[in-house]
Amino acid sequence: MLHPRARTMLLLSLPAVAIGIASSLILIMVMKIASVLQNLLWQRLPGTLGIAQDSPLWIIGVLTLTGIAVGLVIRFSQGHAGPDPACEPLIGAPIPPSALPGLIVALILGLAGGVSLGPEHPIITVNIALAVAIGARLLPRVNRMEWTILASAGTIGALFGTPVAAALIFSQTLNGSNEVPLWDRLFAPLMAAAAGALTTGLFFHPHFSLPIAHYGQMEMTDILSGAIVAAIAIAAGMVAVWCLPRLHAMMHQMKNPVFVLGIGGFILGILGVIGGPVSLFKGLDEMQQMVANQAFSTSDYFLLAVIKLAALVVAAASGFRGGRIFPAVFVGVALGLMLHEHVPAVPAAITVSCAILGIVLVVTRDGWLSLFMAAVVVPNTTLLPLLCIVMLPAWLLLAGKPMMMVNRQKQQPPHDNV
């Protein structure tokens, strides 16, 4: 016979698995549609018209039209494509299901059009809304927070292809007690995350790791080097934190999201022309291209880091529907490669992983997620102790500092003004 605690944990197991599978399938569907549209916009259409896909006019034109299209969706769709991600944490409150079609369309347009944002925030928002709406009908005795946690965990597992990230994130938010141990509370979310990760793995494998030279043995000087790299990444990230609410306020004075996002898309197009095609899109595939290109110099990496960070701020401030984690990882990789080129004595594994740790920590203010991203992009067990040590001064630097988010009470997203 199972203990009552075990029966309690098993109660949500089937819903957790179902939510994890559904979360992954929704992610896969959105990414597949976006990939087809991206191929049409950036490969087939310019080829048919006899235009180079890296033509400045094409880059500016596609991103400007993408901004206008997303603005029209936000302006006229029911629910105005959900909340402005610049004003929301990664895991937020459920939104009405009526806003989901507009949110999904806005996300697909942004991903396909080359906007420097990832899918994580909108996909989590969509899956939370569906889980809460359906779960409340099927199992009304289960509270909304449980459905929110399961949907978030399932989506995070699907996004990263592993339940580890969900375990790390929720281990600090689901506090245990004398009556309910932490792992009892983690059981159902981990089931959802595992189901999401395994489902994603049936269709494709998220590829985060970079072909960076293996790091052998940790030295004391490496800790100092890593801390300096993380501090540089944090400094760069805090510039973006300072810029985001100010640019957001300035752009949303126009009130109409079509104008705001059209101008935002035009600015992104100019940044894309300066940085080149590798500086477009969410950044995961592009960082692989950046590492593979042996022709890049220190100044090239610096330019890519600056352009991508600027594009991230502009896209978020404009109100594009997307997440900030994936492009932040690209910025960290570019910064790390730049610092390694500048000081070759410091291994690239240290500069890249510590730069990712620093910049993701600024964007998410989540220590576990920052460690996870650094560890999966530069997969080397020798680095783990160093990253844990470097996290300490990095966390001290950010203690009490503002987050990369717009204060909703001061700044209203564009759909609130229509």
From Swiss-Prot:
InterPro entries reported in the protein's UniProt record: Chloride_channel_YfeO (IPR022969), Cl-channel_core (IPR014743), ClC (IPR001807), ClC-type_chloride_channel (IPR050368)
Residues spanning the membrane: 9-31, 55-77, 90-112, 122-140, 147-169, 189-211, 223-244, 259-281, 301-323, 343-363, 376-398
Domain of life: Bacteria
Pfam families, A to Z: Voltage_CLC (PF00654)
GO cellular component terms, semicolon-separated: plasma membrane
Major localisation: membrane
Subcellular location: Cell membrane
SUPFAM superfamilies from the UniProt entry: Clc chloride channel
One example GO MF annotation: chloride transmembrane transporter activity
Membrane topology: Multi-pass membrane protein
Keywords: Cell membrane, Ion channel, Ion transport, Membrane, Transmembrane, Transmembrane helix, Transport
Family indicated by similarity: Belongs to the chloride channel (TC 2.A.49) family.
Protein name: Putative ion-transport protein YfeO
